[in-house]
């Protein structure tokens, strides 16, 4: 039976919807009374695991799930050994550098050497500033990253931005974009090669709704 890792949080609703379009129903995860973390599709063709968004690539990499849905940001941050198969065309956001609106820094190049940057995307932030050849200290924060510059702990932050509302409400502005992110279908590489007949069919079915969405 096919096992799929689905992410908790912002990507869950649309992840379930896209599987519904190809005949797999995991909508029980959306029931407020549901406490199960593993459910089987009513047709008994597949089961789904409900896991933290950052853990989806882990379950896929270690073979506990053959397919999964993960944000491109998570894939860049974690660099898992998985096959990145399809851009699913939802969950759009961007990874940005932001500073206080009254900051003298108008560009990342203005951030002083050995300045401090708060982020929960430590690897993405390190890679970005390394490419710019700017030595900075990355401070790992895993909640309310905006408080870094507000409290004076950091000069800037690197974080995901969707509408930008949270930044604006906390007096922050974007000064650069690292990359755009969206939901991706990922697969366990060995399973995708060895069990290609089963997995390939599902992957091709998933390409159809995403192709249609791209044409709208």
Swiss-Prot record:
Its EC number is 2.4.2.17. It is found in: Cytoplasm. CDD domains: PBP2_HisGs (cd13595). The keyword Signal does not apply. Belongs to the ATP phosphoribosyltransferase family. Short subfamily. Heteromultimer composed of HisG and HisZ subunits. This is ATP phosphoribosyltransferase. It comes from Microcystis aeruginosa (strain NIES-843 / IAM M-2473).
């Amino acid at each position: 039976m096919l096992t799929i890792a689905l992410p908790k949080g912002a990507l869950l609703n649309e992840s379930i919807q896209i599987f519904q379009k190809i005949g797999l129903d995991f909508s029980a995860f959306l029931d407020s009374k549901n406490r199960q973390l593993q459910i089987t599709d009513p047709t008994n063709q597949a089961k789904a695991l409900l896991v933290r968004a950052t853990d989806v690539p882990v379950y896929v990499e270690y073979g506990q799930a053959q397919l999964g849905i993960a944000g491109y940001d998570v894939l860049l941050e974690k660099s898992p050994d998985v096959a990145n198969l399809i851009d699913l065309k939802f969950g759009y956001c961007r990874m940005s550098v932001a500073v206080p609106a009254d900051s003298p820094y108008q560009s990342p190049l203005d951030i002083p050497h050995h300045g401090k940057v708060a982020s929960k995307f430590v690897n993405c932030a390190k890679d970005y500033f390394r490419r710019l050849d700017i030595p900075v200290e990355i401070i790992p924060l895993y909640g309310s990253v905006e408080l870094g510059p507000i409290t004076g702990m950091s000069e800037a932050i690197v974080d995901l931005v969707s509408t930008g509302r949270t930044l604006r409400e906390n007096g922050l502005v974007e000064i650069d974009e690292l990359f755009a992110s969206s939901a991706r279908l990922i697969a366990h590489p060995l399973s995708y090669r060895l069990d290609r007949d089963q997995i390939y069919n599902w992957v091709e079915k998933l390409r159809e709704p995403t192709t249609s969405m791209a044409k709208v």
